[in-house]
Amino acid sequence: MEQLKLTEQDLINAVCLFHAKFKSVRPEEVEVELSFDDDAGYGAEACINGSCDLYNTTNFITAIRLYIDEQLGKDSISARIVLDIEDEMVAHVSW
């Protein structure tokens, strides 16, 4: 079984790329803050020029899948993605 660990910076990049694609802007224009809440779970807030959108866990995972597909060149459909907080937020990906 192949395994991969995505760092917090990888997760931020994933949301930046996903949000930029969705909003038709450059990734450099997107600011991202990751979050975790006991009730809401993992998420992110992505902002462009002060206009912010919240990503729930499902949308966050979708952004990570796109990152795996487009940036890492791996098939994300069959990947198991587990978010965790160690020293920072990470994603453990396995196929």
Give the location of each predicted region.
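Protein-protein interaction and targeting regions used for scaffolding, dimerization, and localization
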Residues: 1-95
